[in-house]
Amino acid sequence: MKRFILLAAIIFMGTTFINAQELGLNIGNKAPELIGKGPNGETIKLSDLQGKVVLIDFWAAWCGPCRRENPTVVANYKKYKDAKFTVGKGFTVFGVSLDDSPERWKAAIEQDELEWPNHICDFQKWNSKFRMIYQVRGIPDNYLIDENGVIIAKKLRGPALDAALHKYLREEL
């Protein structure tokens, strides 16, 4: 009986591990389209950025770790926005907020100086359709995509973002 329970536990854990690895999007997957409303009510589409290297950045104004990560994202945006990459021309950020307050969202964009023009939010917090499409389970979270919308890296925090962008540079800055 003990062997049966042990065998069942091993099979269950193995199945759970395999299923956990299959969740979310992986490197090599095409990034799903995102279409949302920007801070001024304008429609913003991820596909409009085709040709560039894009960081799809999931965050929220109420998220302390996200706000602490924002200076790193801003520094990399400023450093690489006009760079030439082997996988695209230029770099930008596509900010996807999991906020529920338009006022707090807009204030955080301004306070953290998130100067890229691509910000969307559906104000559904954890029920956000954007979070569900990308199967985001925690924030901050991100995906780096190439000029064709293919995921080339993910979960880039701190110096890992700069290292990933530098890896794809066509020429030194």
Which residue ranges define each predicted feature?
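Alpha/beta-hydrolase fold active-site loops
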Residues: 53-54, 91, 140
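Thiol-/selenol-based redox modules, centered on thioredoxin-like
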Residues: 139-173
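Thiol-based oxidoreductase modules, predominantly thioredoxin-like and allied folds used
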Residues: 85-103, 116-125
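N-terminal "domain-start" segment that seeds a small globular fold
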Residues: 19-48, 170-171
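Conserved redox-active cysteine motifs that mediate thiol-disulfide chemistry
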Residues: 51, 58-75
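Bacterial Sec-dependent N-terminal signal peptides
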Residues: 1-24, 172
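Conserved helix-turn-beta segment immediately C-terminal to the redox Cys motif
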Residues: 68-95
